[in-house]
């Protein structure tokens, strides 16, 4: 499983994880990346902080950031590059997915061939 964090994304995630609330066991936290049906193109990216990955998650490490990938989402995320971009109007994580055949105008959702669910307009 190949998930790549750019230097900027790794820096931002490392700072975010360091500043997130500690759990009772002081467990090392990472990010869990997955996709769900949604958005105007069919699939939406999800990224959550977790210290308890799911048993079937695929685990990789980028710098000092643990990355857990949802096993069911893995085929849709193979080869993804996660970057952090800063702009005048909006800053945030940007996903470059080699499996996406198209993305919506806002860049928050994507389509993969003919297997994507029906999209709904972004709000």
Curated annotation (Swiss-Prot):
Coiled coil: none annotated. GO terms for biological process: iron-sulfur cluster assembly; nitrogen fixation. Keywords: Nitrogen fixation. It comes from the Bacteria. GO terms for molecular function: 2 iron, 2 sulfur cluster binding; 4 iron, 4 sulfur cluster binding; iron ion binding. Pfam families: Fe-S_biosyn. Belongs to the HesB/IscA family. NCBIfam families: iron-sulfur cluster assembly accessory protein. May be required for efficient nitrogen fixation. PANTHER family: IRON-SULFUR CLUSTER ASSEMBLY 2 HOMOLOG, MITOCHONDRIAL (PTHR43011:SF1). This is Protein HesB. It comes from Nostoc sp. (strain PCC 7120 / SAG 25.82 / UTEX 2576). The lineage of its organism: Bacteria, Bacillati, Cyanobacteriota, Cyanophyceae, Nostocales.
């Amino acid at each position: 499983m190949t998930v790549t964090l750019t230097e900027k994304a790794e820096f931002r995630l490392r700072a975010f994880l360091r500043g997130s609330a500690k759990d009772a066991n002081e467990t090392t936290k990472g990010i869990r990346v997955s996709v769900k049906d949604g958005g105007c193109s069919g699939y939406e990216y999800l990224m959550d902080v977790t210290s308890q990955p799911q048993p079937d998650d695929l685990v990789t490490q980028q710098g000092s950031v643990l990355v857990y990938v949802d096993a069911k989402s893995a085929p849709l995320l193979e080869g993804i590059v996660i970057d952090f971009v800063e702009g005048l109007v909006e800053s945030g994580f940007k996903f470059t997915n080699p499996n996406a055949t198209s993305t919506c105008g806002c860049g928050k959702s994507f389509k993969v061939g003919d297997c994507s669910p029906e999209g709904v307009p972004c709000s």
